[in-house]
Amino acid sequence: MKAAGAFRWTVAATVLAAMLASALSFRADAQSEYMRGDRMPYDAFDRLPRTDIEVPGGTIHVAFAPGDITLPKEKLLDWIRMSARAVTTYYGRFPVASLRLLLVPVDGGRIRGGTTWGYRGAAIRIPLGRDSTEDVLQRDWVMVHEMVHTALPDMPDRHAWLSEGLAVYVEPVARVQAGDLNAREIWQAMMRDMPKGLPQAGDQGLDNTPTWGRKYWGGAMFCLLADIDIRKATNNRLGLQDAMRGVLAAGGSHEQDWPIARILATADKAVGVDVLTRLHNEMGPKPVTPDLAALWRDLGLKRMGEDIEFDDSAPLAAIRKAITAPHVQ
C-alpha cells in the first residue's frame, strides 16, 4: 500500500509538473508571438478581443496579449484614459483617428518601456509587469511618451533625436497641463537630467551622434531651447506647443513619413518664426553646448539640495510659467 501510494503521488507530481510546464510554455509562446522582433504584430493584434476607448479626435483600440495581470482590467483602461487625456490636452485632440494599443503581460511590477509604429496604422506595444500596482500606473510616464510619438511623422534614424527628444520634453509638460504632475517635479527633473544631453568628446552634432544621452536628452534640450526662443520671439504668446499642433494640423502624424526639414518648416510656419529650422541648422551638424546654469537662473530655478525654488522675478520666469500652463485657444 505504501509503495502504491508513493507511486500514485509520483505520477500525480509528474502530471502536475507537466501541466505546469505546458502552461508556462504556452504563456511563453503566446508572449513571443507578441514580443518577437522589432515590428508591431499587427495581424496577431487583430485576432485579439479589443476594448475601444473614445477620446477627442479618435479611438484607442486596446488589446491584451495572453497572460495574467493582477490589476482589474478597468484600472488599466483608466490608466490609458488618463494618459490619452494628457496628450489630448497638449495637442488639442488625440493625434491619430485610430490607435492600436497592445499590452503584453511580463514578469515584474513595472512598465518595461514601449514602442510606437505607424507603417500599417498607428500602433503602440507596452510590456506591462503583471504585478504592477495602481501607484505604478499613476506615476507612469511611458504611456504618454509613446502616445506623443504618434503626433510626429516618422523620420530617418539619424533624426530620431527629434522624435525621442520631443517625447521626453512634451510628456511631463502635458501631464502638468492635465493636472497629473506639478510643475516643480518636472523642472527639478530637467535640472537633474538635462546635462545628460550635452555634447561629449567627439560629438558631431545631434544629426550625427546617436548616443543615448544625445538622442533623448539632447533632443529634449533642443525642444526646451526652441520653446523658449519661440516665446521670446512672440512675446510669450506662442510656444513649441503651438508649433507642434501646427504639424499635426497639417497631417503630420506618425502614420506619415516626412523629412525633418518639412517637419520643422511646418512647425515654424504655425508660429510665424523660423526658430526650429534655425536651431536645427546650428545644433544638427555640429555640437552646441548651452550654458544650462545660466538658463536655469534666467528661468528662475534655484537648486536647494534635493529640491528647487522658483524665483518669479527672474527674466524668463513668465516663460517658465507659460510652458506648463494650460493652453489657451
List the predicted regions and their residue ranges:
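Juxtacatalytic substrate-recognition/specificity segment
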Residues: 49-155, 159
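Beta/coil-rich, acidic/histidine-enriched accessory regions frequently appended to metallopeptidases
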Residues: 32, 253-329
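Soluble non-cytosolic domains of exported or imported proteins
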Residues: 70-82, 133-138, 142, 157, ...
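Bacterial N-terminal signal peptides
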Residues: 11-23
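Long, contiguous juxta-domain segments that are non-catalytic but functionally important
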Residues: 31-46
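Boundary at the C-terminal end of the N-terminal hydrophobic targeting segment
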Residues: 23-32
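Bacterial N-terminal signal peptides that target proteins for export
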Residues: 2-14
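Acidic/His/Gly-enriched intrinsically disordered linker/tail segments
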Residues: 157-227, 233-234, 240, 244, ...
